[in-house]
């Protein structure tokens, strides 16, 4: 493939945009560097870059594009918004309709509030939990990303359960010291942390199914233990479902797993490709939010008609019969094909898959927590990424990210992808 225009535009971008990208995850730093491919348009399951190269897309914008790009029903909703005003600064009937849809899909959402991103949604649930409990500390799990607010850009210290240290320059140590980090899927470490700090903990923040160091499911009993131990000391439980909501079924991962949190943060899929976030939960907790309560949260763009109408349209598509069966079928087909060729060429991989989302780890070790994900072979993934890119397969440029299948993908797309995987594995084997 020829990437001349992408390379030229990236050099130009470096002159005007920090790092040449508007999110560090779009950089190719984690896969050896170089110019990221600059995409010009997208339709269905496909991208076309500025050099005219076509790709099958498994990035799906890091999760939101579950219907495929430019889905006609969502496009029509966005066009309606454009023709009737995209921002009012007033209540609209659309936000009521959408709130009702979310409540019906995820029963733990007794009340909801719209914001503009998953980062905002998580940030505000933490504020609300602190307001409700009168406590300051938060427990999170190592490797789980919850947006870029100071509250959650915190890394684990040494030991199985620790007060955090800043995971970014510019995050005060004083904020990091309010965050306790423990390994995901480790009930003993969580219990140890709560035994020590539980009476100071406002909330436990967790992805019910991890999406940010790959797709990692909770061990049986893990989430129930979180609920039981947290509630025993008066702490709340917050589910970050920014990635997981509507990804595996119509509703949240909490529906799938049969365990309800006190508060939930949403984003990505619920916007149909436009910027959005939402949070909600128990009525008595949500009534801490202004104008009813003392926990302040506001937003000029919150609940704007364009994002809300796109979100309604997206959920209407996802309500159709056979949607999640299609994603699961293609996911199983892709997983089986990759595993077959890995065995043929003796490539060490482990695949974590749930429905239409999967992560291919270059390791023989089972991946159930961040420490295990860290140990996977990033150098081999980087080579694999480039080999796939040159065959027209667009993956996230990180060993930690998921492959997302959309409603627009076909069996033919999966078959071509499996063939590309075989060629990539053959090249890796012959090095």
UniProtKB/Swiss-Prot annotation:
Pathway: Porphyrin-containing compound metabolism; protoporphyrin-IX biosynthesis; 5-aminolevulinate from L-glutamyl-tRNA(Glu): step 2/2. It comes from the Bacteria. Keywords: Cytoplasm, Isomerase, Porphyrin biosynthesis, Pyridoxal phosphate. One of its GO terms (cellular component) is cytoplasm. The keyword Isomerase applies. GO terms for biological process: protoporphyrinogen IX biosynthetic process. It catalyses: (S)-4-amino-5-oxopentanoate = 5-aminolevulinate. It is found in: Cytoplasm. CDD domains: OAT_like. Belongs to the class-III pyridoxal-phosphate-dependent aminotransferase family. HemL subfamily. Homodimer. HAMAP family: HemL_aminotrans_3. PANTHER family: GLUTAMATE-1-SEMIALDEHYDE 2,1-AMINOMUTASE, GLUTAMATE-1-SEMIALDEHYDE 2,1-AMINOMUTASE 2. NCBIfam families: hemL, PRK00062.1, PRK12389.1. This is Glutamate-1-semialdehyde 2,1-aminomutase 1. It comes from Anoxybacillus flavithermus (strain DSM 21510 / WK1). The gene is hemL1.
């Amino acid at each position: 493939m020829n990437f001349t225009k992408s390379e030229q535009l990236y050099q130009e971008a470096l002159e005007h945009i920090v790092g040449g990208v508007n999110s560090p995850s779009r950089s190719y730093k984690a896969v050896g560097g170089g110019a990221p491919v600059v995409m010009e348009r997208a339709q269905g399951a496909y991208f076309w870059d500025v050099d005219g190269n076509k790709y099958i897309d498994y990035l799906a914008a890091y999760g939101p594009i579950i219907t495929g790009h430019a889905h006609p029903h969502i496009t029509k909703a966005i066009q309606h918004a454009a023709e009737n005003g995209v921002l009012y600064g007033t209540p609209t009937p659309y936000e009521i309709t959408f709130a009702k849809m979310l409540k019906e899909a995820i029963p733990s959402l007794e009340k909801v509030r719209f914001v503009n991103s998953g980062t905002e949604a998580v940030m505000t649930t933490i504020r609300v939990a602190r307001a409700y409990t009168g406590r300051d500390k938060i427990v999170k799990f190592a490797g789980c990303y919850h947006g870029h607010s100071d509250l959650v850009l915190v890394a684990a210290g040494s030991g199985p359960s620790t007060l955090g240290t800043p995971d970014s320059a510019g995050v005060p140590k004083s904020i990091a010291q309010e965050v306790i980090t423990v390994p995901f899927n480790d009930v003993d470490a969580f219990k140890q942390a709560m035994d020590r700090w539980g009476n100071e903990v406002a909330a436990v923040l967790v992805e019910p199914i991890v999406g940010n160091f790959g797709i990692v499911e909770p061990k049986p009993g893990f989430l129930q233990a979180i609920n039981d131990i947290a509630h025993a000391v008066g702490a709340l439980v917050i589910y970050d479902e920014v990635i997981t909501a509507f990804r595996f079924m119509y509703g949240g991962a909490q529906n799938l797993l049969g365990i309800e949190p006190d508060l939930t943060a949403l984003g990505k899929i619920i916007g149909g490709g436009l910027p959005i976030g939402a949070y909600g939960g128990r009525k008595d907790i949500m009534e801490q939010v202004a104008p009813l309560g003392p926990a302040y949260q506001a937003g000029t763009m919150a609940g704007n008609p364009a994002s809300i109408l796109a979100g309604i349209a997206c959920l209407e598509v996802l309500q159709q019969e056979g949607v999640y069966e299609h994603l699961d079928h293609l996911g199983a087909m892709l997983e089986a094909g990759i595993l077959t060729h890995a065995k043929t060429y003796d490539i060490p991989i482990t695949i974590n898959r749930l429905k239409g989302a999967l992560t291919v780890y270059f390791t023989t070790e089972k991946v159930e927590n961040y420490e295990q994900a860290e140990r996977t072979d990033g150098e081999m993934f980087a080579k694999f990424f480039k080999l796939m890119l040159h065959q027209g397969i667009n993956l996230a440029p990180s060993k930690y990210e998921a492959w997302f299948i959309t409603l627009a993908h076909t069996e033919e797309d999966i078959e071509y992808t499996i063939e590309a995987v075989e060629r990539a594995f053959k090249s890796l084997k012959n090095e």
